[in-house]
Amino acid sequence: MKGLIARFIAGFALLLWAWDMVFPWQQLMQAEENRYNQIQQRKILRVGMVNHPLSYFIGAEGTAGIEYELAKSFANYLDVRLDIKTFDNSEQLFSALKDNKVDIAAAGLLYQPELSKQFQIGSAYYSASWQVVYKKGSNRPYKLSELEGDLIIPAGSAVLPILQRLKEDNPKLSWQTTNQFTQEELLLQVAEGKIPYTVGVSVDISAAQHIRPNIAVGFDLTDEAPVLWYLPNSSYSELQAAVLDFMNHANETGLISRIEEKYFNHLAHFDYVDIQSYLKAIKLVLPKYQSLFEKYCGDLEWQMLAAIAYQESHWDPNATSPTGVRGMMMLTRDTAERMKITDRTSAEQSIRAGSEYLHMLMRQIPETVPKEDRIWYGLAAYNMGLGHLLDVRRLTRQLGGNPDNWLDVKKNLPLLAEKRHYSGLKYGYARGFEAFQYVENIRRYYSSIINHQRVEEQQIQNNEEQPSVPQEISKESDSTLKE
C-alpha cells in the first residue's frame, strides 16, 4: 500500500540477510530438523490464522481473505497442500508457532522488534499502523495523555506488547482486556458509544468505517510498519528463503497488486455523509426490494445486484435523469425496448431487465478475462457501452498493458476522455473517468452490504448470548503477555 510494497520486499530481503549475519542461526539449534524439509516430506503447509473480515473468513463463495489467498498461492508455489489452523487471537497463534503446531503465522501481523527476536520473519506485502479510535462527535484525543478513560483491547491482541512499552513513558496509560469481543466488535462498540476507545490496525479501521462511519481515528499509536508472516525460530533458513522468493514472485507477477485491489483499494474513498445515507437505506429501503434482487441476480450475488441498483438510483424506482434514463436500474428507452419491458418505473421489471442486460454484456467479454474480474468489465460496459470497453482494452494493449488484467484496464479508463488517445479509437470519446468511479462505488457499496449483514447477524447473537461489556473486561494495565 501507498507504493511501499516493492520497497518493503527489497528492504526486508536486506534486513533478513543482515539479521542472519548478526545472529548465526546455525550455531543455535544444530540438532533441529529442517522445517522446510518437513513441509516437503509431509506435503502439507500448516498456516495459523485468526478469523478476520479482511485476512481470513468463510464467505458466500467459500474461504477468502488476504492471508488465505497468499497462503494458498504459497502452498501451490511449494506444490503442497494447504492446512489452515485457526486461533482465537495472536497470543494463541504465536504460542502454536513456538510449539511447532504451525509452520507460518499469517494474520495481518505487523512487524514488531520484540517478536523478530523470537521468530524468523518473512517479507512484507503491505503496510499499516496501529491507531486509537473514538466515537465521532465526542472529544477527540490527539495523544495518549488526552485519553479520558481506558483503552479496551481484545485479550491476546498483538498490540499489548506495544502498550506495555508505551506505558514506560506514559505511566498513566491504562487499558482493559476482554475475552468476549473481537477487535471488530470493539470497533463497533466505540461507534455505538458503549466503550470510549479501542486500538485497531489502520486497514481494519478503514473497513469498519464503511459499516459504522461514526468510528473516527484519534491518532496513530505507532508509525506505519510492514505486515508480514512470522516463521519459527530456526537454525535453518530454507523456509524463510522460500517465503522471500515467493513474495518476490507474487510482487513481480502482480498477485499482490490483485489482492490489494480486491480487498483494499475500494476502502480508500470514505465519504461520511454518503455512507450514513447508504446505511440508512440498507435498513429502511433495501428490505422492500431484497426478494427481487435475490430472484433476478442470476450468476451474481444478490448483494452485487443491489449495489448496482443503489449506484444507479439509490433504490428509487421512479428515479429519472436529465438524459432520459429512468427507473431502479436507470435504463434507456432503447435498452428497455431491447429487454422487452413495458414500464421502466416498475421495480421488478427494471431489476430483471438490468440484470439480464448486464449478463448479456458479460457474455460478450472475451473469455481470456479471468472469471473473478468479468463483473468489473461488465459494469464498465453497463456504464459507458460495450464499444468503449473494447476500445479501452485496445488502448491498454497499445500502452503495453494486459487487456485481461482489470488493474491495467481500470487505470486507462480516464484516458478515453483525452483527445490524444480517443482520436485513434473506433468508438471515440467516452467519459471513462465516470466509468472508473462507477465501478469503484459499486465495489464499495457491495462490500458494505456484505459486512453490514455479517455484523448485524453477529450483534444479534451477541445480544442474545452475552452480558454487558463491563462484566466482560478485566484490568490489564500492569499485565504482560505470556512468553
From Swiss-Prot:
What broad class describes the main subcellular location of this protein? membrane
The similarity annotation says: In the N-terminal section; belongs to the bacterial solute-binding protein 3 family.
**What's this chain's function?**
Murein-degrading enzyme that degrades murein glycan strands and insoluble, high-molecular weight murein sacculi, with the concomitant formation of a 1,6-anhydromuramoyl product. Lytic transglycosylases (LTs) play an integral role in the metabolism of the peptidoglycan (PG) sacculus. Their lytic action creates space within the PG sacculus to allow for its expansion as well as for the insertion of various structures such as secretion systems and flagella.
Pfam name, any one: SLT
Q: Does the keyword Nucleus apply?
A: no
**The keyword Membrane belongs to this UniProt entry's keyword annotation:** yes
What segment(s) does the record annotate as region LT domain?
A: 269-483
Q: How does it sit in the membrane?
A: Peripheral membrane protein
Entry keywords, A to Z:
Cell outer membrane, Cell wall biogenesis/degradation, Lyase, Membrane, Signal
- Comment, domains: The N-terminal domain does not have lytic activity and probably modulates enzymatic activity. The C-terminal domain is the catalytic active domain.
**Where in or outside the cell is it found?**
Cell outer membrane
Q: Which domain of life is it from?
A: Bacteria
Query: NCBIfam families, from UniProt?
Result: PRK10859.1 (NF008112)
Q: Which PROSITE patterns match?
A: TRANSGLYCOSYLASE (PS00922)
| GO CC annotation, single | cell outer membrane
Indicate the secretion signal residues: 1-18
Could you tell me which InterPro entries the record lists for this protein? Lysozyme-like_dom_sf, MltF, Solute-binding_3/MltF_N, Transglyc_AS, Transglycosylase_SLT_dom_1
Q: Which GO terms describe its biological process?
A: cell wall macromolecule catabolic process; cell wall organization; peptidoglycan catabolic process
Reaction equation(s) it catalyzes = Exolytic cleavage of the (1->4)-beta-glycosidic linkage between N-acetylmuramic acid (MurNAc) and N-acetylglucosamine (GlcNAc) residues in peptidoglycan, from either the reducing or the non-reducing ends of the peptidoglycan chains, with concomitant formation of a 1,6-anhydrobond in the MurNAc residue
Species annotation: Actinobacillus pleuropneumoniae serotype 5b (strain L20)
Which residues does the entry assign to the active site, renumbered to this chain? 312
* Basic and acidic residues composition bias: residue spans: 473-483
The upper taxonomy is:
Bacteria, Pseudomonadati, Pseudomonadota, Gammaproteobacteria, Pasteurellales
Q: Which Gene3D superfamilies does the entry link to?
A: 1.10.530.10, Periplasmic binding protein-like II
- PANTHER family this protein is in? MEMBRANE-BOUND LYTIC MUREIN TRANSGLYCOSYLASE F (PTHR35936:SF32)
The molecular function terms of the Gene Ontology recorded here are: peptidoglycan lytic transglycosylase activity
Official protein name in the record: Membrane-bound lytic murein transglycosylase F
